[in-house]
């Protein structure tokens, strides 16, 4: 490992801060969880956000160090369109950072940073410059004391560049930055000057001193616990240490670019190779975390990244878009771009990454080729500086699925301006058309109604974890999307209660069913007011009980007894707990990077969707079943706990992508090795599940597999049914149950032998029943109609019959009321008259089919068979006259 390589700098940084009392934290996932404001982790401080806002420690640690995987492509942090055109922009990058949560502050942070850049990175003090916030005299004085710099080397910056805030309100504070001067031969001026945007002075490290909290009035109030948040981009740090101004000239990127040049050629097209090098890293890391290309959210960002790389590969070589062939430079140990030492998930998921990149590239190339041809037509006559009309880009996007970013890239390469307003207009009109043609079901109005009711009554209090029935008050009744005061027998309505034992559908688990019985209110003549709860769903944090009133009347304000269907709930609990165990087993025994992509917990089965590149083998399925059942039989207690989201994730709990979690309190469900954030209902002990059986495994999308399974009594019932079937088969075969397999093999072998004999008999019938017609040039025609002989037997006959080089065979049979005519022509005869030519002669008889010179197949009406054979006879005798 070179002392200046990316790997060595990462290693030095982490070891330096661990040695100086910091707790080492592994990188959090790129796919940000528990933070609705982020698509991806875009900064080193993101995993510690709650510690900064609360001033609390992280797992008891007051200091931390990490090398955080980051992605800026999509959402408010988006560098995608700049990648390839600048020296420093990336979609994926690593952020080195050290953090303090109420422990040390400015002086210690500055001292550690200075020691690292001068002693560990070995940067010359003469090349370093410092910036501080203009009002932060304290930081200025500390830097002056530690570095000995003159005042003009510590620059005061008055803009927001040197004052960081988490948002309009909340923690904030001044920043201080370390800059590196590449020297006079590079264009640019020092920070704060009019030439500061040039590459000569490069920001290496940013130190944020979080010491204030800005309130809603804009006032800055001192924080009780001052914090430190620092960030140093690893790629930029490597460029400085290696003495290059361009991140793409560092060791890792040079290796990836060389590999791209080997795969696609055109070494002079630096932009294309830079894009491929950057995007292959970003895509590989996202796929390793279980993401797959799609049309929404994070999945769409991944799709855009891959397709942009494919587009540049196409630019380099239109016949080759195999971007997956670049991947090994990152995953093969010993290669110059190897990242598997720091991120072993790349190596573990190499097959999945390769498969996803290949499939997405192959699936997109036709769209790309078609879109490029259409775009070339539109822009072929445009000169640099002219405008590419937005409606053209919209047509490509809307009609042909051609990504807008690729259109923008091409416009930029040609020096064209882009009519963004025209594109936006097309998008707006499309959305208006969609709204106009959409036939609604009152969902918007219904949603507003539930929001109003939630504002009035607050969230439903759910007590279903601890009890199966409770007394409650009817807060609201809705029928046909409108609030009503009462509902009568025979009507359907939704009842809203103040407290409910009914679990509302969420997290993949189906909602409860049961009954609501009136306790107070108007009694009917039979004395009982009863509502059957047919389903429970959630809207605006309210539990909506969908009911059919079976007797009596219900009024707003009534007191009721609410009771769930306990047997159904028990089956749901078993299936939900089994789903957690299945997820854990898949991650432990199949692939540690498997993640849930969807699930269904029903009363009669469970369904689990997960990322995996290939179908599970029979051996893998058997292993999964065996391990899940082993964990069930271990009868471990199922434990629940409530803690902060950050504490749960740090404690190893799995958070599911796409789910929204509170930062302050989440529910953690643990059973043995499984620990997940989950609000569903579960068994008390794993043994309560009873048993587990996989009933199917299939693929539902690119890189996504689905397992369906049953548990408990369903497994027992299934085994009993299978046993009955097995017993019936053994009785029919006349063998003991233990010998059924051998009996079936014997039966199948006998069947095959009989079929062979039958085929031979059919062939003899054909040969003995057709009369040869001798034509000229030694050609012999054989025609016949055998309505009871199967097509496959005739096809088999043709294989041997066509060995007669001057033979022509036309043999018909009947299938499902239609005639099928098989025509075979020997090699010598086919040079004059082929089988496919004979098919054409039957067009007047509505003969439909085709083939080649040696073999063809035609379908026609049974009544036309004899005329078809006569037509063939006439054609053959004309072609080969005697």
Swiss-Prot record:
Enzyme Commission identifier(s): 6.1.1.7
Record InterPro entries: aa-tRNA-synth_II/BPL/LPL, Ala-tRNA-lgiase_IIc, Ala-tRNA-ligase_IIc_anticod-bd, Ala-tRNA-synth_IIc_core, Ala-tRNA-synth_IIc_N, Ala-tRNA_ligase, Ala_tRNA_ligase_euk/bac, Thr/Ala-tRNA-synth_IIc_edit
Family in the record: Belongs to the class-II aminoacyl-tRNA synthetase family.
Keyword check for DNA-binding: no
Binding site for Zn(2+): 576, 580, 678, 682
Keyword presence, Transmembrane helix: no
Reaction equations catalysed: tRNA(Ala) + L-alanine + ATP = L-alanyl-tRNA(Ala) + AMP + diphosphate
Cofactors required: Zn(2+)
Localization, UniProt: Cytoplasm
Domain-level remarks: Consists of three domains; the N-terminal catalytic domain, the editing domain and the C-terminal C-Ala domain. The editing domain removes incorrectly charged amino acids, while the C-Ala domain, along with tRNA(Ala), serves as a bridge to cooperatively bring together the editing and aminoacylation centers thus stimulating deacylation of misacylated tRNAs.
GO MF assignments: alanine-tRNA ligase activity; aminoacyl-tRNA deacylase activity; ATP binding; tRNA binding; zinc ion binding
UniProt remark on cofactor binding: Binds 1 zinc ion per subunit.
Main location: cytoplasm
Protein's name in the database: Alanine--tRNA ligase
Function: Catalyzes the attachment of alanine to tRNA(Ala) in a two-step reaction: alanine is first activated by ATP to form Ala-AMP and then transferred to the acceptor end of tRNA(Ala). Also edits incorrectly charged Ser-tRNA(Ala) and Gly-tRNA(Ala) via its editing domain.
PROSITE patterns named among the record's database cross-references: AA_TRNA_LIGASE_II_ALA
GO cellular component: cytosol
Keywords: Aminoacyl-tRNA synthetase, ATP-binding, Cytoplasm, Ligase, Metal-binding, Nucleotide-binding, Protein biosynthesis, RNA-binding, tRNA-binding, Zinc
PANTHER family: ALANINE--TRNA LIGASE, CYTOPLASMIC, ALANYL-TRNA SYNTHETASE
GO biological processes: alanyl-tRNA aminoacylation; negative regulation of DNA-templated transcription
Enzyme class, first EC level, given as a word: ligase
């Amino acid at each position: 490992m070179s002392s200046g390589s990316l790997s060595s700098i990462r290693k030095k940084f982490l070891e330096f801060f661990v040695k100086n009392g910091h707790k080492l934290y592994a990188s959090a996932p790129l796919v940000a969880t528990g933070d609705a404001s982020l698509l991806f982790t875009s900064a080193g401080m993101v995993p510690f956000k709650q510690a900064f806002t609360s001033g609390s420690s992280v797992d008891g640690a007051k200091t931390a160090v990490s090398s955080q995987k980051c992605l800026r492509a999509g959402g408010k942090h988006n560098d995608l369109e700049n990648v390839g055109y600048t020296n420093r922009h990336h979609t994926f990058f690593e952020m080195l950072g050290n953090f303090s949560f109420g422990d040390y502050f400015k002086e210690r942070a500055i001292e550690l940073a200075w020691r690292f850049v001068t002693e560990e990175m070995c940067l010359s003090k003469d090349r370093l410059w410092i910036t501080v916030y203009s009002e932060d005299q304290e930081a200025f004085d500390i830097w002056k004391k530690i570095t000995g710099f003159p005042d003009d080397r510590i620059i005061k910056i008055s803009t927001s560049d040197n004052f960081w805030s988490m948002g309009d309100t909340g923690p904030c504070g001044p920043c201080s930055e370390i800059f590196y001067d590449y020297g006079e031969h590079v264009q640019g001026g020092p920070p704060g000057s009019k030439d500061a945007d040039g590459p000569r002075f490069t920001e290496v490290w940013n130190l944020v001193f979080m010491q204030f909290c800005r309130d809603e009035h804009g006032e800055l109030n001192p924080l009780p616990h001052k914090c430190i948040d620092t960030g140093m981009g690893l790629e930029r740090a490597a460029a400085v240490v290696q003495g290059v101004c361009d991140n793409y000239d560092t060791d890792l990127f040079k290796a990836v670019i060389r590999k791209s040049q080997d795969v696609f050629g055109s070494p002079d097209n630096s932009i294309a190779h830079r894009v491929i090098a950057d995007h292959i890293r970003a895509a590989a890391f996202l796929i390793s975390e279980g993401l797959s290309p799609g049309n929404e959210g994070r999945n769409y960002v991944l799709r855009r990244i891959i397709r942009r790389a494919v587009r540049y590969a196409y630019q380099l070589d239109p016949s080759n878009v195999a971007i997956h062939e670049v991947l090994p430079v990152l995953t093969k140990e010993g290669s110059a771009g190897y990242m598997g030492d720091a991120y072993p998930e790349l190596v573990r998921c190499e097959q999945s990454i390769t498969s996803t990149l290949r499939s997405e590239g192959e699936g997109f190339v036709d769209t790309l080729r078609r879109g490029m041809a259409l775009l070339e037509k539109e822009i072929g006559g445009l000169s640099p500086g002219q405008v590419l009309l937005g409606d053209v880009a919209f047509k490509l996007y809307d009609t042909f699925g051609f990504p807008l970013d690729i259109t923008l890239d091409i416009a930029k390469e040609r020096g064209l301006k882009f009519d963004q307003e025209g594109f936006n207009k097309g998008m707006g009109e499309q959305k208006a058309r969609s709204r106009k043609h959409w036939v609604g079901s009152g969902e918007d109005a219904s949603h507003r109604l539930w929001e109003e009711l939630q504002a009035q009554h607050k969230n439903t209090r759910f007590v279903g974890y601890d009890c199966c029935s409770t007394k409650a008050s009817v807060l609201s009744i809705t029928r046909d999307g409108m609030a009503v005061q009462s509902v009568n027998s025979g009507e359907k309505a939704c009842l809203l209660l103040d407290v409910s034992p009914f679990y509302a559908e969420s997290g993949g688990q189906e909602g409860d069913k049961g009954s609501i019985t009136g306790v107070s209110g108007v009694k009917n003549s039979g004395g009982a007011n009863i509502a059957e709860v047919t389903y429970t769903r959630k809207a605006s944090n309210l539990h909506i009980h969908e009911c059919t009133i079976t007797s009596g009347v219900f009024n707003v304000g009534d007191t009721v007894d609410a009771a769930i269907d306990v047997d159904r709930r028990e089956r749901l609990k078993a299936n939900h707990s089994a789903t957690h165990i299945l997820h854990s087993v898949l991650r432990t025994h199949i692939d540690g990077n498997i993640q849930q992509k969807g699930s269904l917990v029903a009363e009669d089965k469970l369904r689990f969707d997960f990322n995996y590149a290939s179908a599970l083998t029979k051996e893998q399925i058997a292993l999964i079943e065996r391990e899940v059942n082993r964990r069930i039989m271990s009868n471990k207690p199922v434990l629940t706990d409530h803690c902060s989201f950050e504490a749960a994730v740090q404690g190893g709990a799995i958070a599911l992508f796409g789910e929204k979690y509170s930062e302050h309190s989440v529910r953690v469900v643990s059973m043995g090795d499984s620990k997940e954030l989950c609000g569903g209902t579960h068994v008390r002990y794993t043994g309560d599940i009873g048993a587990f059986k996989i009933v199917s495994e299939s693929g539902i999308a690119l890189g996504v597999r689905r397992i369906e399974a049953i548990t408990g009594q369903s497994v027992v019932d299934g085994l009993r049914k299978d046993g009955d079937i097995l017993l019936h088969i053994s009785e029919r075969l006349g063998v003991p149950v233990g010998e059924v397999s051998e009996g079936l093999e014997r039966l199948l072998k006998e069947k095959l032998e009989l079929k062979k004999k039958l085929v031979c008999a059919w062939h003899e019938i054909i040969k003995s029943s057709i009369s040869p017609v001798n034509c000229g040039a030694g050609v012999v025609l054989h025609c016949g109609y055998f309505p009871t002989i199967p097509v496959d037997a005739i096809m088999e006959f043709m294989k041997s019959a066509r060995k007669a080089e001057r033979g022509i065979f036309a043999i018909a049979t009947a299938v499902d009321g239609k005639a099928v005519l098989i025509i075979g022509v020997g090699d010598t005869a086919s040079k004059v008259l082929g089988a496919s030519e004979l098919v054409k002669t039957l067009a007047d008889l509505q003969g439909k089919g085709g083939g080649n010179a040696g073999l063809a197949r035609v379908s026609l009406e049974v009544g036309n068979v004899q005329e078809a054979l006569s037509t063939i006879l006439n054609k053959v005798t004309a072609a080969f006259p005697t």
